[in-house]
């Protein structure tokens, strides 16, 4: 399952695509604050 911001989780593990995650942090910071961290994806 893809949760947005570069985070992918399976039944037994989760992984982070750090390139995507770091690229999205700045883009989503304000939106995350406004939505309780549900922005992006």
Curated annotation (Swiss-Prot):
InterPro entries: Bacteriocin_IIa_dom_sf. Belongs to the bacteriocin class IIA/YGNGV family. GO terms for cellular component: extracellular region. GO terms for biological process: defense response to bacterium; killing of cells of another organism. This is Bacteriocin bavaricin-A. It is found in: Secreted. Its main location: secreted. Keywords: Antibiotic, Antimicrobial, Bacteriocin, Secreted. It comes from the Bacteria. This heat stable bacteriocin shows activity against species of Lactobacillus, Listeria monocytogenes, Pediococcus, Enterococcus, Leuconostoc and Lactococcus.
